[in-house]
Amino acid sequence: MSKLPRELTRDLERSLPAVASLGSSLSHSQSLSSHLLPPPEKRRAISDVRRTFCLFVTFDLLFISLLWIIELNTNTGIRKNLEQEIIQYNFKTSFFDIFVLAFFRFSGLLLGYAVLRLRHWWVIAVTTLVSSAFLIVKVILSELLSKGAFGYLLPIVSFVLAWLETWFLDFKVLPQEAEEERWYLAAQVAVARGPLLFSGALSEGQFYSPPESFAGSDNESDEEVAGKKSFSAQEREYIRQGKEATAVVDQILAQEENWKFEKNNEYGDTVYTIEVPFHGKTFILKTFLPCPAELVYQEVILQPERMVLWNKTVTACQILQRVEDNTLISYDVSAGAAGGVVSPRDFVNVRRIERRRDRYLSSGIATSHSAKPPTHKYVRGENGPGGFIVLKSASNPRVCTFVWILNTDLKGRLPRYLIHQSLAATMFEFAFHLRQRISELGARA
């Protein structure tokens, strides 16, 4: 297959709508976005990563205390040794000041990051600077080395723990909380600008559409349509899962400037990654296709069960249930990857299909269904929020941009680097087969 012509490459830039704003992406109410990312006053008082940091600070104090007690527990007795180290304190021989230093770190860090919930590094900078300076001076001027192993152990452990706390806060706590806050603000901006769903129906003569799909009136919302049919509790849960997956996909699209480039190929396909709060590393395939968006919508989104005819990365695809016009449950079996090292996996997903002014969207997430319980034949994988997006070109209806967002847990004991390599390779292979399918359909036409 030849590379993309230069003029088609230029069309790529025009075909991708501006996704820097979620205003044209989110199609959900403020209540849904708030459910995904609640406002600060309704979120947990302390994030998981901050709570882990506070536990580590507590461990610092307890560990230093334990080592000090062990040092005090000699033949002369703990009480006599305490009097000698505290009441008859001597800077050169006492370990009491190292315990006080650990308590200083404990009280200062918990006050700043647990009680006051500060989001700045200045508190830990002070505690680490004081700890480091004090320990260096004490090692130089004291006679602790004459006490044997503990003369080495306590200062070294105290120094290492202080710097581990600094690393944990600066590289884990603050960046992750800032990322979650940025996602929340992006969702709030999107909700404020309002949804832009395309409610007009496409004619059946253009391409196949599922029975009663998008058949509601122009002004009907999902809730109004759902109200006309009584859903079971499980069906309502499927609908909710589909909407939540769509909201996360919309937020990922809105963060395109934060996508991290991973690799590309000779056809112009590019794979990016992004860290999504609560879901982890997500892979994104972006490729230009020289065909109308409706054709890709037909082949990839509306008829997933026929994808096995041309997509070699999938060996089986079955629709287990159509919950309502926009929501369905699918069962997929992926082909092996990485030369057979990654064995085939099966997935059960809930999918939500939406048609908008500038794009077609199929988003999904892992779920369970009684028709396909886990079996010994395949390892049951779990997909996080992801899906297919077909972006229309504003200037040329004969071209489009295809985006595949993939967040998956393949389960099994596989090295992380191998999983990442196999996912990127699978995405490139999918794009290759999709391009071949488009060429075949074009030749038939």
Curated annotation (Swiss-Prot):
Catalytically driven reaction(s): cholesterol(in) = cholesterol(out)
Keyword Phosphoprotein in record: yes
Chain ranges on the Cytoplasmic side, renumbered to this chain: 1-51, 116-120, 170-445
Motif FFAT, chain ranges: 206-212
Factors inducing expression: Not regulated by increases in total cholesterol content, or by marked alterations in cholesterol flux.
Effect of residue 209 to D: Does not affect VAPA and VAPB interactions. Does not interact with VAPA and VAPB. Recruits VAPA and VAPB around the endosome. Restores cholesterol accumulation in late endosomes. Moderately interacts with MOSPD2
Tissues in which the UniProt entry reports expression: Expressed in retina.
Modifications after synthesis and translation: Phosphorylation at Ser-209 is necessary and sufficient for the direct interaction of the phosphorylated FFAT motif with the MSP domain of MOSPD2, VAPA and VAPB and allows the tethering of two membranes that participates in the formation of ER-endosome contacts. Phosphorylation of the FFAT motif leads to conformation changes. Additional phosphorylations around the core FFAT motif (QFYSPPE) are not essential but strengthen the interaction with MOSPD2, VAPA and VAPB.
SMART domains, per database record: START
Recorded GO CC terms: cytoplasm; cytosol; endoplasmic reticulum-endosome membrane contact site; endosome; intracellular membrane-bounded organelle; late endosome membrane; lysosomal membrane; mitochondrion
START domain sequence ranges: 230-443
Family: Belongs to the STARD3 family.
Free-text comment on this protein's domains from its UniProt entry: The FFAT motif mediates interaction with VAPA, VAPB and MOSPD2.
Subunit field text: Homodimer. Interacts (via the MENTAL domain) with STARD3NL. Interacts (via phosphorylated FFAT motif) with VAPA (via MSP domain). Interacts (via phosphorylated FFAT motif) with VAPB (via MSP domain). Interacts (via phosphorylated FFAT motif) with MOSPD2 (via MSP domain); this interaction allows enrichment of MOSPD2 around endosomes.
Known function: Sterol-binding protein that mediates cholesterol transport from the endoplasmic reticulum to endosomes. The sterol transport mechanism is triggered by phosphorylation of FFAT motif that leads to membrane tethering between the endoplasmic reticulum and late endosomes via interaction with VAPA and VAPB. Acts as a lipid transfer protein that redirects sterol to the endosome at the expense of the cell membrane and favors membrane formation inside endosomes. May also mediate cholesterol transport between other membranes, such as mitochondria membrane or cell membrane.
Protein name, per record: StAR-related lipid transfer protein 3
Organism field: Homo sapiens (Human)
Lineage of source species: Eukaryota, Metazoa, Chordata, Craniata, Vertebrata
